[in-house]
Amino acid sequence: MAKPLTDQEKRRQISIRGIVGVENVAELKKGFNRHLHFTLVKDRNVATPRDYYFALAHTVRDHLVGRWIRTQQHYYDKCPKRVYYLSLEFYMGRTLQNTMINLGLQNACDEAIYQLGLDMEELEEIEEDAGLGNGGLGRLAACFLDSMATLGLAAYGYGIRYEYGIFNQKIREGWQVEEADDWLRHGNPWEKARPEFMLPVHFYGRVEHTQTGTKWVDTQVVLALPYDTPVPGYMNNTVNTMRLWSARAPNDFNLQDFNVGDYIQAVLDRNLAENISRVLYPNDNFFEGKELRLKQEYFVVAATLQDVIRRFKASKFGSKDGMGTVFDAFPDQVAIQLNDTHPALAIPELMRIFVDIEKLPWAKAWEITKKTFAYTNHTVLPEALERWPVELVEKLLPRHLEIIYEINQKHLDRIVALFPKDISRMRRMSLIEEEGGKRINMAHLCIVGCHAVNGVAKIHSDIVKTQVFKDFSELEPDKFQNKTNGITPRRWLLLCNPGLADLIAEKIGEDYVKDLSQLTKLHSFVSDDIFLREIAKVKQENKLKFSQFLEKEYKVKINPSSMFDVHVKRIHEYKRQLLNCLHVITMYNRIKKDPKKFFVPRTVIIGGKAAPGYHMAKMIIKLITSVAEVVNNDPMVGSKLKVIFLENYRVSLAEKVIPATDLSEQISTAGTEASGTGNMKFMLNGALTIGTMDGANVEMAEEAGEENLFIFGMRVDDVAALDKKGYEAKEYYEALPELKLVIDQIDNGFFSPNQPDLFKDIINMLFYHDRFKVFADYEAYVKCQEKVSQLYMNQKAWNTMVLKNIAASGKFSSDRTIKEYAKDIWNMEPSDLKISLSNESSNGVSANGK
């Protein structure tokens, strides 16, 4: 007799991840075996699991390439406006499963792999994360690429193909240790090298001014070799391109006079040129003016703009008169979005191309340049803003410095004309800062050189307008906009939480995957006890799966019915992992004080990387791991409280932990987190949020109702008032006995008995240099956590609140964000045309998604 189907299997029969056709499965198996034999040159006797992963990846890629080519043909034929998303980071994660979902192949692939006697999950786990980003900024770029393809926009992501991505984090004896992320060592089946589009990038040299114009001469040349990765939209046959540049030394690099020099040394020196794309810089929100980093920023910009102009000239809009290309139509055909200030050199570089090479008059070139560029600001922390030393720019990019000076002069002339007596305003608004050595303020360059500037959440955009760039918004108020960040529901629901995705589809249909606002329909089920129980059941399945993963990876046995309290993001003082840690110790002390008292069991999971040079962040990790050591080994605590530090947090680990989370920690000091996107991922996956009124938390509370989040602590105005009054940490320490006990324990070596003064730097910072005011929010945070525990005991009330949050999360789709960018900044129209494959029609496009 057949076994009864599990809930998961029943749901898969009506899954939104594609219908399994017998032909599909047979074709996939055939493709798999073909690649195993002809691409990998293996048979089943000698093939390894990695070979099977590669065979599957190539098979899936076969289904991409036709769509990829048709998409590019369609863009060439129709000449739509194109948007270029310039970012030094693209935190893509893994590609295989996301591609299967977006092509509607997942169930067919699952079935084919099952019939081949292999384990799909095992194959998916073999793929390396493409960790070409630090955190939110790079992951946002990845979500945006998915949305741009899904919305049918002619979009390109441009960045650097780092040989080493964000470091792998190991925890040894409680300390973070960094290891290189050699993510390409086994090869990457998703990329295609395009040596035919290799381009020269110039550095150093000098500037010659002649009668005929200005020339940048005697430069060192590095070649930029593009690698293309396909970016499939969801079920629309659109496949866009992410083009990442790799640095190569030219053949004659340092060899011009090797006869009199050292040929071997000259060849070895080629590494110097190729170092440009060697490694991603870890971000600690603290700007350091490193020459190699500036080279990276110019490298991506120079290669990309040559590519953009080549593509424009090849289109019907790149018309020529007797003098050369006419660029009047350029801003109507090209939009370039700068993801933070890292690609800001694109502004003087485009001016250099227009003025020096294409011989446009300055005023004309400037008008076109401004209309082309837009800038997204991602941080309000002043120490994080890029300010490059003038002498470094002068050495590396002498012509660009001249252009920046010229831009600044014209900008300041305008300020003087408008505010003739306001010298301090002129100094504040200059692109060149004079204090402590001349520096170029890259954010000011972006604001002056772009037609639109946006923040990434309402509260952040307000701070940008009224505080950080107040002078500029007074000058051009219409330039400043808000575009609240979003996340792609394909990866952050369908891929990572298929149980919940299918459950939602049962109730409201499948269209929500491309229109997340439809989740509001779930509001009508908040009183449906059966549905609430099903949602709770999916959460429990995810928790069970994750607890098995934790036991396997960390050898810690946890209680899967405990509350999973999760805090995963970069380790930084402003994100306040320390506040969470103080609460953990407080809970520990309460259990020890009264072991018989009922305590709502919790598993506190903290994860994230500290930048290698950021001492305080590394100390915070050591404190968390030391506290975990004590708590997890105390028999009196047992399964009531467990603390896990998640090693090497990355996209593929986020996909596991987020669906299993009950409580999401979003506790930055109000006014410091620009937006956050982790908060949105947790909300969509049925976790409740404990957080401050900061970043996108504010809008999450607006959407779901503040009563459906656990909001605590100071608001932005309270923080400002406390700054004005003067923050005295000691006052809180003296007034709050539980806080005093916790701090004394850390200070006297309770968590580091072999090194009692191990955490003196943390204690010293908390008392005397804490810009993020941990003590000021401690009491409110602990009280709010008590409310969380209380509600968790009432599972029906908890699950009702969960459903209200899921139903309110539709705003936070990156599809909505990208539609706003397209309408308000890029002047582009999303398209719901489904590009037909060549055998479907002659004109290459079918309407109505057919």
From Swiss-Prot:
GO cellular component, one term: cytosol
Residues annotated to bind AMP: D43, R44, N45, Y76, R310
Record-listed N6-(pyridoxal phosphate)lysine modification sites: K681
Cofactor: pyridoxal 5'-phosphate
Compartmental location: Cytoplasm, Cytosol
Post-translation changes: Acetylation, which is up-regulated by glucose and insulin and down-regulated by glucagon, inhibits the glycogen phosphorylase activity by promoting PPP1R3B-mediated recruitment of phosphatase PP1 and Ser-15 dephosphorylation.
Residues found modified as Phosphoserine: S15, S524, S527, S561, S639
Protein name in the entry: Glycogen phosphorylase, liver form
Species in which this protein is naturally found: Mus musculus (Mouse)
Gene name of the encoded protein: Pygl
